Amino acid sequence: AFLCNQDRISGTDSLGGFGYDLDLSVPFVTTAIHAGHRVRSELAPLMAISEKDRLAEEDTGTDRIIRACPSRIWGLDSRAEYDLNRPPELALPMTPEMFWDIRVYESSPTDAMNRRSLEKYAAFYRFSATVVKVLLDRFGACIFYDIHSYNIQRQVDKGHRAPPVFNLGTRGIDRARWEKPVAAWLDHLGQIKIPNRLTTVAENDVFGGMGEFCCRLTQWDPNILVLPTEVSKIYMDEHSGVVHNSKILALKNGLAKAIRAHGQLFQSSYT
């Protein structure tokens, strides 16, 4: 209800799991749900995973990359605590198989601790549902740019010769219905300029876009389009965690420009 009569709202969720800076006068939102690095103080002493290994699996810097976008939501908690892009029954990494064969916990969290993690997970989706309802009530359709980043070396190790800078996953959406905005988004991504790097774009190459965020929102209403967009970690040394600020800046400016143009095109065509 607190969103219904407002155009601009920003803050942090009461449980602290995510931040938001929303412009509800436009039908498009950019998210970086895996940007977070924080782990609750009650969980940190139980963990076996090193901070370096945890950082490698997080989408480091994606909150900075979306910072110039007009309307955005970003995660603050580490996906080693709970993963917003998995269904709730798989969101807590209790075994190495659930976290790229990395053992997250030395000692298992209590049931109460796990409940608190899942409460933060649920709070994110309740908030997202409220945002979606406001946008659908106002515009009749809305679009979410679901921004992630991925480790290049892992794809190379799998035999991928040239992992793309941008990968759009469309296996979780009605590809035929959204043909025009999908094609336009791929085109906009290809126009983003990055220092000393050829911008390459692919669809369903390294990822198919079947994460929980896309699948859940897509099931809520047929007039919601989610575009799961992976950026390769060209903007950092994925082994040391050192970020290259010039590339972050180029991605931030390029993505904001692309989203404004594409979002306005979506608004004129579908709302």
Annotate each predicted stretch with a short phrase.
Residues 1-271:
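N-terminal catalytic or cofactor-binding beta/alpha core of small enzyme domains
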